[in-house]
Amino acid sequence: QGIRLSDKYNKMLKEIKDFNYTAIYNNEKFKVYRDYVALVIRSIFNTLMKTYDVCNPYKSLDNIDCMKEAYPMLAGDFYKHIKVYSNIQGDNEKYKNKKIYGNIETKEIYAQAIIDYISGMTDRYAVEIFNELLKY
């Protein structure tokens, strides 16, 4: 059956949830923040997705490497992420983890690698990366 609360605590939990929705989730300021976060995440995702080479997934690493001058943090860190979690870099044997992306044979696997990379970011780091995308 799962966890059950007494009527008293169930009512208290409902009041807290109602407050959260009224004061936080449905607040206009939170909507602006939610839109900002969506922009940050989409911008990072789209920038990295442009580096995928459909004809030759191995070339994707070269494409990431070419981005290092414009986006040193983003390119450097994502390059390392791909290197650690895939089989497409020759010297990755020193990393004993499972190579969850294999040879990154498809665009979908590459997209998942990007999603996993972004999901591991702190809010502060994601904003730093986003600011790097804005610099000329």
Annotated model-derived regions:
Residues Q1-Y136:
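Histidine-centered, transition-metal-coordinating active-site segments
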